Amino acid sequence: MYFRLLIFYIFMFMACTPNDTSNSSAVPLRSEIDDKYKWDLTKVYPSDEAWEEDLKKVKELSPKFADYKGKLLSSSANLLEAIELSEEINQLFGRLFHYSANSLNTDLKNEKYQAMYQRVRNAAIKSGEYSSYYAPEMLEKDYSVVESFMDSEPKLAVYEKSFKDLYLDKPHTLSENEERILTMTGKMSG
């Protein structure tokens, strides 16, 4: 039985091995592909330099989120400012990741884009450390506080579902220190 299986696999291997080993059927290099078939990442960033500027910007903005620690729910204005800052940071990270990941996906051997992807990943981990207090601090107060803030500041009403989801997850939310440690484990995972 073993011998028959071995013969079967040998014949299958031979049948699947191409006869023509020339490069004529090889996957073309990216430089050989017509531009109309390539991602146009210039719509995300016109250049790597523009990407660098936004990475610098997100690294400057991220620590500012920590300024709201301990006073996040002291007023509706503070909560709104913190959320708007968080949104700005998250939008920047979205673009930064999209550009670096898709640039890397065009050539996984490209060390420049490997480094860019790793740099934005590290910046996101660091940003997560600055914001690790957010959920635990929000959940220290009753949801009625957030509801009153939404009543007094109409711009907060668009975040109602996010607030409700956060409070629904309260039983599964870690302390600030545990959240920070969990965020920091991203440094070890890749």
What is each stretch, according to the model?
Residues Y9-T17:
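Hydrophobic h-region of N-terminal signal peptides that target proteins for export
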Residues C16-G190:
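A well-structured
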Residues M1-Y9:
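Sec-dependent signal peptide recognition
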